A protein has these predicted regions:
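Acyl-donor binding region in acyl/amide transferases
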Residues: 63, 103-262
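Short catalytic/ligand-binding loop motif for oxyanion handling, primarily in non-cytosolic enzymes
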Residues: 92, 140, 181-186, 273-276, ...
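Long, continuous compositionally biased terminal/linker segments
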Residues: 85, 280-309
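Short, cationic low-complexity segments
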Residues: 300-326
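Conserved N-terminal entry element of GNAT/NAT acetyltransferase domains
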Residues: 1-39
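A short helix-loop-beta-strand connector motif used in the catalytic cores of GNAT acetyltransferases and
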Residues: 73-83, 262-263, 273-279
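Short, basic, low-complexity termini and linkers enriched in Ser/Thr/Gly/Pro
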Residues: 327-344
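Short amphipathic alpha-helix that is part of the acyltransferase structural core
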Residues: 24-74, 78-97
Length: 344
C-alpha cells in the first residue's frame, strides 16, 4: 500500500478552474460544478485522484497506489471529470467521471473489464449511453460537523443533470454501485435480491464476466419480502439491513428513487479496487421522475456555458463518427485487396 500524495496547492487548482469549464451553480450550499479532462487540467486531475484514493481506501477499497488515476482517466478520448467545487473553502467536495458513448464499441469503458455486453445492448443501448464511474465525496464532507455535507450527493446530481442537458442524444445512464467487503453478507444479499426483484434485466443485456454466487434463489427472501408493493417491501428492506447494523448505500438509495425502470445486472468482485463488490445498473433518462428532472436539469443561470460545452461535445461526436467511418472504409479496402490477391 503506497502512501497517498500530499494535497495539491490551492492556487494551482484555482488556476485551472477557468470560466469556460464551469457548468453551473448547485441548487444548495453555494457550490459550483466544473468539468474537464486530465489533459486540460493536470493539477485538478491529480487532486481528484488523491481525494478518490483517500475516500475509497478509508471505506475499504481503493487502488493501493499513491493516487487513483488510471489509463482511462488520461486517455485523449477517455473520461471527463465532473467535480463539485466549494468556493468558500476552496476545495473539491466530490466528483464523478463520465464518458459519452457514440458507437456500439466505445473505447476506455471501465465496465468492460468486469461485464459482458450482449449484441442487443451494444447495438441498441451503448451508442446512446453515458457511462458513469468513480463517484466520491471527500472525507471532510462525509461528517455531520461540516454543514455542507448533507448536500454533497445532491450537488453531484446537479452536475449530472447539467451533463445530460449537454448531451441531449443520451438516453441511458450506465455504471456500477459499490459495496465494500466490510458490508455484512446478510444485508448485501437482501439488498441485491430486492434490487433484482424490482429492477430486473429481463432482456439479459449485461452479464458479469465472473459474477458472484449470491444464492438469491433461497425461498427465505420470498418469505421475508411479504409486502404488497415496493414501498412496503422497501420498509422491510430497511429493517432487515438495520438489523445487521448496516445502511443502504446512499448512491443505491438515490438510484432507486430516480426512475421506476432502472435495470440491475450481476454483481462482480473488482480485484483492482480492493476486492469491492460492484453491481451493474442502467437508467433510462426519459423515465426519470419529472420532479427529479425539474430539480436537477433546469437551465436557469447556466445557459451560456452549457451552449459552449454542448458545441464541444457535438464536435467531438462528429469527429468520433468520422473515425468510425474511416476505419470501416479501411477494413473494406483491405478486404477488397485480399480478394484481388486470391483471384490472382
Amino acid at each position: 500500500m503506497e502512501p497517498i500524495i500530499a494535497p495539491v496547492e490551492r492556487e494551482l487548482l484555482k488556476a485551472e478552474l477557468t470560466p469556460e469549464r464551469k457548468l453551473r451553480d448547485t441548487n444548495h450550499a453555494g457550490n459550483e460544478i466544473y468539468i474537464f479532462t486530465a489533459e486540460e487540467c493536470p493539477m485538478l486531475m491529480r487532486e481528484v485522484g488523491r481525494l478518490r484514493e483517500e475516500a475509497f481506501r478509508r471505506a475499504g477499497g481503493g487502488t493501493g497506489h499513491e493516487v487513483d488515476i488510471d489509463e482511462e482517466d488520461v486517455a485523449p478520448d477517455g473520461y471527463y471529470q465532473l467535480i463539485v467545487w466549494d468556493p468558500e473553502r476552496e476545495e473539491i467536495v466530490g466528483g464523478y467521471r463520465f464518458i459519452v458513448c457514440t458507437s456500439s464499441n466505445p473505447h476506455h469503458l471501465s465496465t468492460e473489464h468486469y461485464f459482458r455486453f450482449s449484441p442487443r445492448f451494444r447495438r441498441r443501448y451503448l451508442p446512446y449511453t453515458l457511462e458513469l464511474g468513480r463517484s466520491f465525496v471527500q472525507i471532510a464532507y462525509q461528517t455531520r460537523e461540516n454543514r455542507k455535507s448533507i448536500y454533497a450527493l445532491d450537488n453531484l446530481w446537479d452536475g449530472l443533470g447539467a451533463v445530460l442537458v449537454l448531451n441531449p442524444k443520451v438516453r441511458y445512464l450506465f455504471g456500477k454501485v459499490t459495496m465494500y467487503t466490510s458490508y455484512r453478507t446478510e444485508a448485501r444479499n437482501a439488498l441485491i435480491w430486492f434490487l433484482h426483484h424490482y429492477f430486473p434485466d429481463r432482456e439479459h443485456l449485461v452479464e458479469g464476466i465472473h459474477p458472484l454466487k449470491l444464492d438469491l434463489d433461497d425461498p427465505f427472501y420470498e418469505q421475508l419480502f411479504s409486502g404488497e408493493n415496493f414501498h412496503e417491501n422497501y420498509l422491510i428492506l430497511l429493517q432487515e439491513i438495520r438489523k445487521a447494523n448496516e445502511h443502504i448505500p446512499p448512491l443505491v438509495n438515490a438510484y432507486m428513487n430516480l426512475s421506476p425502470t432502472m435495470r440491475v445486472f450481476d454483481t462482480v468482485s473488482n480485484p483492482d479496487f480492493g476486492d469491492v463488490e460492484e453491481t451493474g445498473i442502467l437508467l433510462t433518462v426519459p423515465d426519470i421522475y419529472p420532479e427529479k428532472k425539474a430539480r436537477y436539469m433546469r437551465w436557469v443561470g447556466w445557459r451560456r456555458n452549457l451552449r459552449a460545452r454542448r458545441e464541444e461535445f457535438r464536435i467531438a461526436w462528429i469527429d468520433h463518427l468520422d473515425r468510425i467511418k474511416k476505419r470501416r472504409e479501411q477494413r473494406a479496402k483491405r478486404k477488397e485487396e485480399r480478394g484481388k490477391r486470391k483471384e490472382r
